[in-house]
Amino acid sequence: MKNFSKILLAIGIVVGGTLIASTPARLDYVPLSNENPDLEILLSEPLEQLIPGTEKRLVWHDGEQRTQWAVVALHGFSASRQETAPLANLVATSLGANMFETRFAAHGLKNNGLVGVTAEEWLDDVANALTIGHLIGEKIVVVAVSNGAALALSMLDHETMQNVDSLILMSPNFAPADPKAMWITAPGGPLLLRMIAGDTQSWEPHNDLQGRYWTTSYPTKTLIEVIRVVDRANEKIESVKAPRVQVFYSPNDSVISTAALLLAYEKIQTPQKEINKIMKTGSPSAHILAGDIISPDNTLSMAEQIEDFILHQAL
């Protein structure tokens, strides 16, 4: 009996150690500040590896000169700048602003999309995007979707956020629709994820253009990086004051938890915030709220709402 107890103890130690060892690291990474930013270097990327139309894009409003406003667009997980286009461009035009649309690491690739990418790389991408925003405009408006919104909130206390006037958050991800997915970053989460979901995630695009500009098949373990970002975003909104915040969401969203979104919205510390419920979308998941590819009918009205929010600051 004593030997049996020892065996059970040994098994427990091994299993416990394995679970702890497989626990994803907390996302505490702080991107380094770029003291002497070079716009050309910040915009550089391996174009030959990218699907045309997914590359970073800088649009000058009136020649290569700084404008009062700068619009910085951050797309969602597995997507590209085409996700809600031309929403950011419409907002920039109405503000007389320069615009930068980023491409997150491992997105928009012709081959091996989302392979080996980390949340730390995405935070670097946000820091670089905001640095570009500072170079092209005095006050930055961030238009961010889903995981891009969570990444923006994850950077609230970073110095690159200092010139951000407004955060426009579309379907921000504070938790997946399936609450069980949050255990991905718990002890043993990655092991369970692989056992339950397999090595690869694949999904059917809504139309040909979504199939072209989104990554529709990727390693399941990449979802761990998404939840690491979500965990950090939830931490930051409770402890760090945000710029002005405007949120758009659909109560029928089947990708993110709207209950978690509404709870998080109440916690956001900001001098001005607004939340807008979008009832009709062209998205089967009700997650992509604007853009020519999925929800074209909402794009113009949403751009007008964003412009109105930006230009009419609370006293």
Q: Where are the regions a protein language model picked out?
A:
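Short beta-to-alpha linker loops that shape the active-site pocket of alpha/beta-hydrolase fold enzymes
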Residues: R103-G108, N173
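Short, surface-exposed "cap/lid" segments of acyl-processing enzymes
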Residues: I51-F104
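Serine-hydrolase catalytic core
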Residues: V59-Q65, Y213-S283, P296-L311
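Catalytic nucleophile-loop/oxyanion-hole region of alpha/beta-hydrolase
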Residues: L109-I136
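Gly/Ala-rich beta-loop-alpha elbow adjacent to hydrolase catalytic centers
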Residues: V143-A152
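N-terminal membrane-anchoring alpha-helices
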Residues: M1-E40
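The alpha/beta-hydrolase serine catalytic core
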Residues: D28-K56, P172-E238, I278-L300
